[in-house]
Amino acid sequence: MGSEISKKDITRLGFRSSLLQASFNYERMQAGGFTWAMLPILRKIYKDDKAGLSAAMKDHLEFINTHPNLVGFLMGLLISMEEKGENRDTIKGLKVALFGPIAGIGDAIFWFTLLPIMAGICSSFASQGNILGPIPVSYTHLRAH
């Protein structure tokens, strides 16, 4: 396995992870986007090992539903484990164990803290007739989404 994951690979993973929900469905939720984001690095790790790549893709195409802004943390952990050649069951177990708590933390930070605070501040501006009132909250909502 011994691949060299570069900063460029990690940056590409980050950009691709922003499309996590592009193939959202109610059977596997974000699994398609999750696997698609990780695929270039998985190909680099498994190189000529078609069976290993196939097993990794199959595992990552299983159900996942987490917070889109914090998914990079989970992807980084899983890529690290893939790189070290960890057992498939260990990798799957970590993914299943962490995607729910990461979703809860992300929801608490973004939807239940950041956005209500921004909405409160910006509604004060808007109520005074300031046209700039809705812009920061709209931007924050779009960035958090």
Regions found by a protein language model. Give the residues of each.
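Juxtamembrane/transmembrane-helix boundary motifs in multi-pass membrane proteins
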Residues: 4, 87, 91-99, 129
